[in-house]
């Protein structure tokens, strides 16, 4: 688990093999993720799935951003299909209790890191397990099984986006 807090002016385009959780603590920050650009505001949480090309840029507001990167090879030992999962947070419903739970978990992880008390590394890993359990239960839109993307019907949130992604991936697997 790698946690960074930063005031972002610009972070060049890159990708990594980890899942990255971006939590805007203050202000706003621009995020380019693939072909899409977003402005994330205070309280917003964005999940960058592994190998997604992304970059950050400043807006007209100063910002403070927490970025938590989870090592997929480590956590896949505990969550078998984690490497094949795709997560989406829908920030349109700010009162969503699942988003509030994510904010709380991320806050506890940050406090454990700042406190650096005895055994804090284990607390951070435990908090990350809680974070992953929440993501898998409430924000997992796809998983890959037998070489095909499967839409997780139990999910809530942006069903339009999930449906669109499901149709696109089904088309790709059927035609290529």
Regions found by a protein language model. Name each.
Residues 15, 96-99, 125, 158-162:
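Short, solvent-exposed loop/helix junctions and linker helices
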Residues 132-154:
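Linker/hinge segments immediately adjacent to helix-turn-helix/homeobox DNA-binding domains
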Residues 28, 50, 113-117, 135, ...:
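A general structural signal marking secondary-structure boundaries and capping sites
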Residues 100-103, 148-176:
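A short, Lys/Arg-enriched amphipathic alpha-helix from helix-turn-helix/homeodomain DNA-binding modules
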Residues 2-87, 115-122:
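N-terminal regulatory/effector-sensing and dimerization cores
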Residues 83-138, 169-170:
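Amphipathic alpha-helical segments enriched in hydrophobic/aromatic residues interleaved with Lys/Arg
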């Amino acid at each position: 688990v790698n946690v960074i807090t930063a005031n972002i002016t610009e972070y060049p385009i890159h990708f990594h093999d980890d899942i990255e959780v971006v939590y805007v603590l203050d202000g706003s920050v621009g995020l380019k993720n693939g072909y899409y650009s977003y402005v994330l505001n205070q309280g917003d949480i964005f999940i960058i799935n592994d190998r997604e090309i992304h970059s950050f840029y400043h807006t007209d507001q100063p910002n403070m951003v927490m970025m938590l990167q989870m090592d997929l090879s480590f956590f896949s030992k505990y969550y078998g299909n984690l490497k094949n999962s795709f997560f989406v947070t829908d920030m349109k419903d700010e009162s969503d209790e699942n988003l509030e739970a994510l904010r709380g978990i991320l806050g506890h992880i940050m406090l454990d890191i700042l406190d650096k008390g005895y055994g804090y590394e284990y607390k951070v890993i435990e908090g990350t397990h809680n974070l992953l359990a929440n993501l898998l239960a409430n924000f997992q839109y796809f998983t890959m099984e037998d070489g095909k993307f499967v839409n997780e019907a139990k999910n809530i949130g942006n069903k339009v986006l999930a449906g669109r992604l499901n149709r696109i991936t089904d088309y790709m697997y059927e035609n290529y």
